[in-house]
Amino acid sequence: MPLNRRQFLATTSMAAAVSAFNRRALGATAPQAAQAPPGTSFVPVRGTIGIFNGQGGTIGWHVDPHAVAIIDAQFPATAKICLEGIDQRSGSRPIDYLVNTHHHADHTSGNPVFRPVTRTILAQANEPRLQLEAAARAAAAVKPGSPPPPAPVVANATYEKAWRKPVGTEVMALNYYGPAHTSGDSVITFEKAEVVHMGDLVFNRLHPYIDKPAGASIANWIRSLEAIAGEHPKSAIFVYGHANPKFGPTGSAADLLAMRDYLTALLEFVRGQVKAGKPREAILAIVEPLPGFPDQGPLVPRVLSAAYEEVAG
């Protein structure tokens, strides 16, 4: 039985204050949280679907008189703000589904805020294991004498390849396209509204995080983006986990194809450097923008390293 929402939110105020822990607790290599939460906003997208901008990956939401679904959880401080706003929109209905698009800290650290008022936390089958492994690494790295991090809250329901159910007046579908950003990325489609939450499969005109230790595959990421773009109507609106402010966290299939082209160019660029005989250290030191992709800015070691690993083996 979910707690009274107001009582629960009051008890989480202090927990939110320690949210800085999450940068280590659920994967130190995941995108980092700022020291102080930035401004937050609720933005309608289409129909019953909207997004919440705060600290971490973009949260998606569906609220109608019969059901509530949330996509991703950010960090505790902004998860609390998000939950308060969802309360206002839903009349404090229990949350039917919280979906984690993948395991990274900036998408799952807010799970403890949502858990007491959520019936089901849903993710791709690989995601809970990846989240627990990241938490174990973080716990092992805690200095002697320091308090251990709290245990992560992981999905209590999973799917392998596809999942689809009515959620109030909507139909929510989850699909897994194989290894890409990680090896547990979900794409969430609200079929009636034609809104598709991509999680971190799209960093809109930003250099992405490519989590090789978690099974990422640039080559399959490229194939996945092309498939997703082709499977949805031209009128679909896509939601992105992270975005260059100049371009924003929502857009069209053209953004997916731009991300596909960026990843293709990244692999080809690094492959060319390897064929030219450049050592890994020299490749990782390249800072010029990737040719044809000035909006992402100078190249950074994290993308070059992932591409090198995929090209050179």
Predicted regions and their residues:
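N-terminal secretory signal peptides and thylakoid transit peptides that target proteins
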Residues: 1-16
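C-terminal regulatory/interaction regions
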Residues: 9, 275-313
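Conserved beta-strand hairpin/beta-sheet module of binuclear metal-dependent hydrolase folds
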Residues: 43-93, 186-190, 194-200
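Core dinuclear metal-dependent hydrolase active-site scaffold
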Residues: 158-191
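Divalent-metal (often Zn2+) His-rich catalytic cores of metallo-beta-lactamase-fold enzymes
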Residues: 222-278
